[in-house]
Amino acid sequence: MSTLLEVKDITKIYPNQPKPGLDHVSFEVMQGEFLGIMGASGSGKTTLLNVLSTIDIPTSGSIRMGGKKIQELSQTQAADFRKNNLGFIFQEYFLLDSLTVQENIAVPLTLLHESAKTIDKKVMELAELFGIASQLKKISQ
């Protein structure tokens, strides 16, 4: 098995904070493994995910994903990396209550500048996959 993710001695220091957000964190994830991140409020989970996803950069240390040192990516490369390699599942989701279910599903695709035809096709595929096609025209609640 090859190493998919290598986190080596990551530290994240925030200005005016008494302790680091991350303090010399190191671990590896091998291809095919799953990793769960748990901890108390304020323990650094969100900070870790932010640096792993290139939303933030560590103060020191290195992160390699597929052999690439991700904190050295340009903003454009980092955006492409997030789009093509990462997925997020949020604990608490947010729907725009002024939009229909269909429009809420379409928001990320619209932000990616997909064509209207592509958006409609993908939204319908997802709606059918999750059994919510009959709910698409309803306002989100």
For the regions a language model picked out, list residue spans one by one:
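The feature captures the beta-strand-to-loop junction immediately N-terminal to the Walker
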Residues: 38-40
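Conserved ABC transporter NBD signature motif
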Residues: 61-72
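Helix-to-loop junction immediately C-terminal to a conserved catalytic motif
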Residues: 53
